[in-house]
């Protein structure tokens, strides 16, 4: 088989970084996708504008669309919003040293913890651009597990950080939550890919 890849998540209703999906295509379709029958296309049709244009497409989903209305950790009741990585800003250009662009798609949600989780906002000293939030006294901090999960399209009530009964420990810590969220295939994305494959399954493999 020749392998071709096509879909980028930024043109669908998800506020996240680009994903690439690889699909095996028969060798007689050497000029895929130009002459590949549209009915056989394994990918959902784009619905939002980001890397492509179209009057029938909706505006891209931004980080602000997803994170709007969430309380700051100190005001939250949700443990997944209260607890977050306290790794300090390094400013050396390495992973996890930039803040979320609220007017664009979100950065990569990594399956790691200390120092690799991007900042929800940086201080003015570190080049932060969310001036209104800083003026309101909001502090420099990294994304919470809840914010990462919303970017990855998990439901807002899906629990990640959980207490271990009456003890001071956790059944699942924030560090483990970051790893689970970062490793996950975004649920809404997986749903739409699966539904499209369901539609074309009989074309590929017969009834």
Language-model segments: which ranges?
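Class I S-adenosyl-L-methionine
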Residues: 1-102
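C-terminal target-recognition/interaction regions appended to catalytic cores
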Residues: 61-207
């Amino acid at each position: 088989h020749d392998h071709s890849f096509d879909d980028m998540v930024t043109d669908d209703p998800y506020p996240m970084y680009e994903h690439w999906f690889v699909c095996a295509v028969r060798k007689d379709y050497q000029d895929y996708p130009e002459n590949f029958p549209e009915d056989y296309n394994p990918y959902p049709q784009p619905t939002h504008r980001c890397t492509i244009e179209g009057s029938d497409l909706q505006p891209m989903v931004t980080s602000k669309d997803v994170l709007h209305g969430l309380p700051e950790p100190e005001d939250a009741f949700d443990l997944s919003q209260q607890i977050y990585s306290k790794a300090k800003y390094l400013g050396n250009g390495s992973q996890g040293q930039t803040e979320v662009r609220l007017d664009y798609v979100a950065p990569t949600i990594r399956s790691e913890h200390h120092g690799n989780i991007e900042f929800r906002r940086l201080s003015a000293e570190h080049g932060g651009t969310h001036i209104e939030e800083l003026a309101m006294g909001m502090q420099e901090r990294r994304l919470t597990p809840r914010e990462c999960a919303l970017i990855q399209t998990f439901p807002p009530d899906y629990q990640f950080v959980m207490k271990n009964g009456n003890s001071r420990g956790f059944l699942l810590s924030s560090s483990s939550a970051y790893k689970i969220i970062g490793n996950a295939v975004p649920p809404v994305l997986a749903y739409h890919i699966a539904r499209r494959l369901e539609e074309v399954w009989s074309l590929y493999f017969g009834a």
